[in-house]
Amino acid sequence: MFDQTTHTEAHPLTVGKIETANGTIKPQLLRDAVKRAVSNFFAQLDGQEAQEVYEMVLCEVEAPLLDIIMQHTRGNQTRAANMLGINRGTLRKKLKKYGMN
């Protein structure tokens, strides 16, 4: 669908391992897991119109990401914001949104 060449190509995020049709084991990329989950979501709609899909998916990924980052930085918001590549004020808003303040 789209080609996203970023610095993460060398170290893609994985969520586990999957067995291919020929029996080899390969890493399951987070990107593929999200794609599969969104496809399953649409398949289960049974003709209903989807609403706010972007926000739904973003919340499903962003909340656990923030939780892990905050644990990793032992609650240091400045370090967490730097690791995420966002402004500390933006991080504070996101933490508040998910009740992590």
UniProtKB/Swiss-Prot annotation:
Cross-referenced Pfam families: HTH_8
SUPFAM superfamilies documented for this protein: Homeodomain-like
Keyword Nucleus found: no
Cross-referenced InterPro entries: Fis_DNA-bd, Homeodomain-like_sf, HTH_Fis, Trans_regulatory_Fis
One MF term in the entry's GO annotations: DNA-binding transcription factor activity
DNA-binding region per Swiss-Prot/TrEMBL record: 77-96
Source organism superkingdom: Bacteria
Entry keyword Transcription: yes
Keyword annotations from UniProtKB, A to Z: Activator, DNA-binding, Transcription, Transcription regulation
Its biological purpose: Activates ribosomal RNA transcription. Plays a direct role in upstream activation of rRNA promoters.
Family to which this protein belongs: Belongs to the transcriptional regulatory Fis family.
HAMAP family the record matches: DNA_binding_Fis (MF_00166)
Subunit structure: Homodimer.
Protein name, UniProt field: DNA-binding protein Fis
The organism of origin for this protein: Shewanella amazonensis (strain ATCC BAA-1098 / SB2B)
